[in-house]
Amino acid sequence: MSDPVIKRALVSVSDKTGIVDFCRELSLLGVEVFSTGGTLKTLQDAGIAAASISTITGFPEIMDGRVKTLHPKIHGGLLAVRENPDHVNQANENGISFIDLVVVNLYPFEATVAKPDVTFEDAIENIDIGGPSMLRSAAKNNESVTVVTDSADYALVLQEMRNNNGATKRETRLALALKVFELTSRYDRAIASYLAGAQHEADSSMTVKLERELDMRYGENPHQSAGLYRLTDENGTRSFSDYFEKLHGKELSYNNMLDIAAAVSLIEEFRGEEPTVVIIKHTNPCGVAQAPTLAEAYRRAFSTDTQAPFGGIIAFNHPLDMEAATAVNEIFTEILIAPAFEDGVLEMLMKKKDRRLVRQTSALPKGGWEFKSTPFGMLVQERDSKIVTKEDLTVVTKRQPTEEEVADMMFAWKICKHIKSNTILYVKNRQTFGVGAGQMSRVDSSKIARWKASEVNLDLHGSVVASDAFFPFADGLLAAAEAGVTAVIQPGGSIRDNEVIEAADANNLAMVFTGMRHFKH
């Protein structure tokens, strides 16, 4: 059978990253777009001719949106086998039109239950019902229906439609369907774990299965053997190929895998935000920045430390465009990671044969358990995935932080948790200015961060400082004040908090407590 041309699309997303541009392109390709609730409003406000799902069902959205897509005219349009005459006749008799493309991502259940103040009622309201149902129907009928759950796949679908007379390829539809069942499996497991209380207390016994996925030449050092194993536990199965596709370069090493995990864990803090670039070396960020374009974000991240990025790993939260790729191409980097690569970018970057190019195909799972092996047993802990929002910040000084200071502090806090302790981090205008990582003394981390900034002539006046744990004494804060810092973000909780607060007030600093520590060993 020939690939079915996409004529009608059903779009309903919680994460609206890229959805306006995607649907605008679909409309230009002649696709009729139907949508629901907030997604419909977003599209119509952007001038896109999207119609309400109610025009298909003839039934309004009811019960605060709990019931809107659970309807025979939706699922019949998704599940009908186009080559089956009985299905086609029944569809015609019941006024059911085929739906060729489903674009759905789910209510953010995992992000919701990761909030420290989440209520049971909030958790329940964020259990998606209609979304998984549509995804599963579309994925089951992947012979005829294209299903997209991740904004990183928008570019791929559009490119195939342009090159294939409005259709996607069979192998693409199958790969996207596989992502659906992996997503819904993880989603249901997260709900079951939350309802069982498994997110808060490890069981007295666990069953974990490891299956070798990739062989490696050696481990952290040449004298150590190593491999990457697919892991199956109570949260499902996780493997490298579930989330990544290596597009170019020699085989990934043990150290590469550690750096990829570090880079992607950090860049995902900025999923759906402005263009952001993360540069990693030995699992620590040496530069992170956000800007209106990826190229500018890269240049700003690189300016934090102009030596460490050589041979490093760079991750992007938007598809890598030619301008940014050209800037990155000026130095040697081990790995570039992006959700997509725009036309011509891969061809240029592939000219350096030793560089690895990796496409992130889907978001890493949030929550779940983290395992660390020791010579005397396995340590198990919840992943450090809890989110601090602006509403969680407690201002403890006389001076309130400005909006710009709050924005910089939130940016710094997202990065801080991904740096080896002890961590002191200086940020200004959504750019790292000085990174002090992995020191036994918090004072030494502060000195290193200041020294790194001075080495590249970055002026710390007007910056903010983040500390992954409380300041045990006022000396660390006073050093930051001397450097020109105007605001401080830290967990709080020291027996000398009052002393530190007094020092902040004496220097007219704004300081906020997060109430959450981010040690990383």
Swiss-Prot record:
Catalyzed reactions: (6R)-10-formyltetrahydrofolate + 5-amino-1-(5-phospho-beta-D-ribosyl)imidazole-4-carboxamide = 5-formamido-1-(5-phospho-D-ribosyl)imidazole-4-carboxamide + (6S)-5,6,7,8-tetrahydrofolate; IMP + H2O = 5-formamido-1-(5-phospho-D-ribosyl)imidazole-4-carboxamide
Keyword Transferase on entry: yes
SUPFAM superfamilies reported in the protein's UniProt record: Cytidine deaminase-like, Methylglyoxal synthase-like
Pfam family name, one: AICARFT_IMPCHas
MF terms (GO), sorted A to Z: IMP cyclohydrolase activity; phosphoribosylaminoimidazolecarboxamide formyltransferase activity
Comment on protein domains: The IMP cyclohydrolase activity resides in the N-terminal region.
Record protein name field: Bifunctional purine biosynthesis protein PurH
Species name: Chlorobium phaeobacteroides (strain DSM 266 / SMG 266 / 2430)
Lineage: Bacteria, Pseudomonadati, Chlorobiota, Chlorobiia, Chlorobiales
